[in-house]
Amino acid sequence: MINKINFVKMHGLGNDFVIVNKRDLATSYNLSHLAKNMADRHTGIGCDQCIIYEENNDFYTMIIYNIDGSSAKLCGNAIRCLAKLIYLDTGKQNITVMVGKKKLLCNVKAANKISVNVGNVSFNETWMPSRDKIWKFAERYMLDLKEMLCVDIGNPHLIIFSKLEPQDKTIIGQKLQAKELFADGVNVNFAEVKDNKIYLSVWERGAGLTLACGSGACASFAAGLKLGFVHSPSTVVFEYGNLIMREEDGNIIMQGAATFVMRGEYYYEK
């Protein structure tokens, strides 16, 4: 049986998403399987992640699926895209989005000026390996590092302050998905700091290297603040654009663009 599903495609600085309203989906659908099929760039629509959202009384919930069908706990670029979509459809400028157990406050100042308060971060969680173990990993692969730091912003990140070649980032990103250090994998951020700007590329667990990562930008900014590498406000630079970061009362606030690409219909054969 073939089912027709309405979708929207958007991107945040090149990090692209297929977004579907849950009301358009049958309750019998395996959402992980659907997301994996939609995300395939050869046989589906193609995206880094698939977003399923639902409207509640005074907030929206969203579920994030990676290209391999696994779920993600947070995605800053996707939240900006969803906030813009809701703004375009309803005119709402102040929007609350719940991801997992975390409520995030979004404000759409203009179509391409969207801020998200992602709350505070943690540098001390049970999933984080000891500093000695992380540095032994770096020594094994002969990484020339300035510093490394684990950050939890609702999802797990390792920030590596170092200048590495693209092929090395791929190798390190893949190696760190093994269970040796991070039982559930980790998002690996490769950060270079210059003139209070963070030049960032991110290996996202379940997705690989992406053109941008909003939660990675927030985590890297928080790490840079803690280590004294940057001050607030700061800019995180990606290949397709920048995010403006600031800290207010312990909360990390991200501001940037979200771009509408298309609306369409996807034919899902169960």
Curated annotation (Swiss-Prot):
Entry keyword annotation includes Cytoplasm? yes
Q: Which residues bind substrate?
A: N15, Q49, N66, G76, N77, N155, N187, E204, R205, G214, S215
- Name of a matching Pfam family: DAP_epimerase
Please list the GO biological process terms of this entry: lysine biosynthetic process via diaminopimelate
Q: Where in the cell is it found?
A: Cytoplasm
Where is the site described as Could be important to modulate the pK values of the two catalytic cysteine residues found in this chain? Answer: H157, E204
Q: Which keywords label this protein? A: Amino-acid biosynthesis, Cytoplasm, Isomerase, Lysine biosynthesis
Extract the SUPFAM superfamilies matched here.
Answer: Diaminopimelate epimerase-like
Q: Which GO terms describe its molecular function?
A: diaminopimelate epimerase activity
GO CC field: cytosol
Catalysed reaction per UniProt? Answer: (2S,6S)-2,6-diaminopimelate = meso-2,6-diaminopimelate
Class of the enzyme per the UniProt entry, highest EC level: isomerase
- Enzyme Commission identifier(s): 5.1.1.7
Which PROSITE patterns does the record match to this protein? Answer: DAP_EPIMERASE
Q: Which residues form the active site?
A: C75 (proton donor), C213 (proton acceptor)
Does the keyword section mention Cytoplasm? Answer: yes
Q: What is its main location?
A: cytoplasm
Q: In which pathway does it act?
A: Amino-acid biosynthesis; L-lysine biosynthesis via DAP pathway; DL-2,6-diaminopimelate from LL-2,6-diaminopimelate: step 1/1
- Family, per the entry? Belongs to the diaminopimelate epimerase family.
What does the subunit comment say?
A: Homodimer.
> What this chain does, per the record?
Catalyzes the stereoinversion of LL-2,6-diaminopimelate (L,L-DAP) to meso-diaminopimelate (meso-DAP), a precursor of L-lysine and an essential component of the bacterial peptidoglycan.
Q: Report the protein name in the record.
A: Diaminopimelate epimerase
Organism of origin is Rickettsia prowazekii (strain Madrid E)
